[in-house]
Amino acid sequence: MSNGNLRKARIMTIHKSVSELIGNTPLVELTNFEKNHNLDVTILGKVELFNPAGSVKDRIAKAMIDEAVKAGKVNDDTVLIEPTSGNTGIGLAAIAAARGNRLIITMPETMSIERRNLMKAYGAEVVLTDGSKGMKGAIAKAQELAGEISNSFIPSQFTNPANPSIHEATTGPEIWRDTEGKVDILVAGVGTGGTVTGTGRYLKSQNSDVKVVAVEPAGSPVLSEGHAGAHKIQGIGAGFVPDTLDTSVYDEVIAVADEDAFETGRELAAKEGLLVGISSGAAVWAAGQLAQRPENKGKTIVAILPDTGERYLSTAMFKFE
């Protein structure tokens, strides 16, 4: 390649905004996990920590703001307010920082200190709510603040159709492209439900035989048993069925115990070199359960790994002697 062509190729890789770095995250085969558990399947992790603010939620943060700007609901002076357990807030904080908007995050006090500090590092204001009230308490506080602050806007990840839509437009097509259509099962945790809904919807549109499996905490089995409860798998298990979850998309729900999610997350770090979060551990544990079923022998399972484990070093998942 000539120097001129090299310069041209290099210029084409320079992005103008952090938001342009979102998406096109890699798939990696969890070969050691497969080997260590004697699994005759291919388990692929979609590693969302490669998004610029470190999680799958960067996708919806950008999408919700972009749609609100198009609709005239957000301008340069708009105060953004969002109830979040963490990752959506971090993604929004990065987008708001780049745009210059003020951002107020309401979140349960039970979320990790890393999540709080990350949002503050991006310049967001964090308002903590009663942990016993879960996400419902954070949502109520966000609505209260929106009523008090003029020119404010709540992206509302739990009700905003841009949430599942961006996964149908990006996450699903990326998986289909990178597997060359060779995907049999999708495994995704349910927080807002946007990932499993949008991604699952796209994959099923390409092949109706693709099985979609939703993952929730065993401590709060809202989808599988109809009741909420306390759990430690941050990012999934909001305690209610969100508007952004289409329950007709998934074929099965697997409930995962806190310790199983912790243990699998630790295993991914120690054996695969993948430092991912608690909900990633839950998704891979569920994938492992599916892999043990005789009918799934030889199949390809894609598990969404939503974020990085660096957000949870202070939690029970990484308590070292």
Give the label of every model feature segment.
Residues 2-321:
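PLP-dependent amino-acid enzyme catalytic core
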